[in-house]
Structure formats: structure tokens, C-alpha cells
Amino acid sequence: MALLPVLLFLAAVLLPFFPASGQDPGFAALSITKSEVQKEIVNKHNDLRRTVSPLASNMLKMQWDSKTATNAQNWANKCLLQHSKAEDRAVGTMKCGENLFMSSIPNSWSDAIQNWHDEVHDFKYGVGPKTPNAVVGHYTQVVWYSSYRVGCGIAYCPKQGTLKYYYVCQYCPAGNYVNKINTPYEQGTPCARCPGNCDNGLCTNSCEYEDLVSNCDSLKKIAGCEHELLKENCKTTCQCENKIY
């Protein structure tokens, strides 16, 4: 199961408010329908991913995903200061993670993403949070090695009071798995795990599938990938042998 903590920039009263059209030109400039905004979001994530400390040997390069963005925008439009349901942000059978950010002013997307990443100051690779109450899940999702699709949305929510600019990014496949949360990527020389599939320190050999059951490795040894059960439920294990997943 993915660890889906409530990860919020600031706390506020949770009430169902409807979005409105932001009058601030700064808000309009943040629309994810703009190609330059999509590029900014992707580039910011990739810049942070390729410069993690310690460096990563298996970090996938992120790309914009329109289906993920649609889900993120739909959730942002609800103006709810809480995470969406897992089924509402899934893309097909693929589970997706989510980061939320709220602000009193229309901050740039780069600033919002940097805010999530700044939780790294409370995180130690291989150990986890430095203190029991530290929030680090935004950071670990941003740098989760196998999350390679990103889509975001933003809404203007004036009835939320001070925090009226609502940013949502969703990531597929989801990160923050409990058994790996302290090591969100594999430490090593950049692209060491993806020779021949490297772009400026990030791996490009992503897997488009996700195993639907947890024991695909053992099932493959017992029945082989030609078995109908594995064809349906173990596509990652059977079709992504030389890919990062």
C-alpha cells in the first residue's frame, strides 16, 4: 500500500467551496493549459531529481501527462484542502500519488514545487524523517525514482479565505511506498541502472505498466509469463525486464 499522508503547506478549515475565476493576471499565467507552464513544471521536477543528494542511479526523467493533469485539475476545482481519493487520481489501473500546496498569493509553479522539495532539510537518505513529527512526503514523492508522469492543476478558491490559490500535482505511478519511504531512489552514479537510456543524468527507460499483484516474481518462476494470470496481472514483471520500475 502506498503511504498517503495528508501533506499540506498550511492548515485551514476544511469546507467545500467552489472555484472562481482568478482576477489576478498572475493567476492566469499559471494555467496548466499553457505549454510553457507544463514545460516549467516538468523541468523543475527534473532539475530537482537529477541533483538529489546523494545522487541517484535509477531516477526516471519525468514527462507531462495530460490524463494525470485532467485528474489534478478536476480535484483542484473542488477547492478542498485534503487529498483526493486514490481511485479519482488513478490513470487506468495505475495508482498515482499527489502533492498539494495552498498560498495567499499566486506563487510560480517552480516556487510551489521547490516548497515541496524543501522538506529534504528534515529528511536523511536511508534513515527517513530526522524527527518524529517531520513532514517529508512531499519531498519523497517529488524525487520518487519510478514516478515519471506528472500532471498538475490550479484553482482560485476565494471562499477559502487567505489561502485561496490551490495547487495540485499528481504523479504516476505513485511513490511513497512504506517499505521504501526512507530510500525513495537508489543511490549511485547517475544513470548507472539505465546504460544507453540516459538523458542528462536521468533514466528514460520507464515502464508503462504496473503489476496488479505483489508476488509476480514468484509467479513468473512457477508458471512463466505465458500463463494468462501473469499476462493480465504481471505486465511489469513480464514486459519491463530492462526498464526502471
Curated annotation (Swiss-Prot):
Residues 207-240 form the ShKT domain. It comes from the Eukaryota. Residues 1-22 form the signal peptide. InterPro entries: Allrgn_V5/Tpx1_CS (IPR018244), CAP_dom (IPR014044), CAP_sf (IPR035940), Crisp-like_dom (IPR042076), CRISP-related (IPR001283), Cysteine_rich_secretory (IPR013871), SCP_CRISP (IPR034117), ShKT_dom (IPR003582). Its main location: secreted. It holds the Pfam family Crisp. Residues 42-171 form the SCP domain. It is found in: Secreted. Expressed in the salivary gland, in the ampulla and the seminal vesicle. GO terms for biological process: cell-cell adhesion; fertilization; sexual reproduction; spermatogenesis. Disulfide bonds join 191-198, 194-203, 207-240, 216-234, 225-238. Belongs to the CRISP family. Interacts with A1BG. This is Cysteine-rich secretory protein 3. It comes from Equus caballus. The gene is CRISP3.
